[in-house]
Curated annotation (Swiss-Prot):
Transmembrane segments: none annotated. The gene is rpmI. GO terms for biological process: translation. Gene3D superfamilies: 4.10.410.60. InterPro entries: Ribosomal_bL35, Ribosomal_bL35-like, Ribosomal_bL35_CS, Ribosomal_bL35_sf. Pfam families: Ribosomal_L35p. This is Large ribosomal subunit protein bL35. GO terms for molecular function: structural constituent of ribosome. GO terms for cellular component: cytosolic large ribosomal subunit. Keywords: Ribonucleoprotein, Ribosomal protein.
Length: 64
């Protein structure tokens, strides 16, 4: 059986921490920002953790 490939799009969007958690950037922070409040945009700047329910799917895409 051949080696399974890593999803290259996922590699660019997620980063695995030393403890095994997966970090991701918030969505909704690229365009049409004038209608969003400063408070909302400030919250979207932060790096978030992948939810436990999504961990398996993201881990399989990263394959490392």
């Amino acid at each position: 059986m051949p080696k399974l490939k890593t999803n290259r799009g996922a590699v660019k969007r997620f980063k695995v921490t030393g403890s095994g958690k997966i970090k991701r950037a918030a969505s909704n922070h690229n365009h049409m920002l004038t209608k969003k409040s400063q408070k909302r945009k400030r919250r979207l700047r932060k790096i978030h953790e992948v939810a436990p329910s999504d961990m398996r799917a993201v881990s399989e895409m990263l394959r490392d």
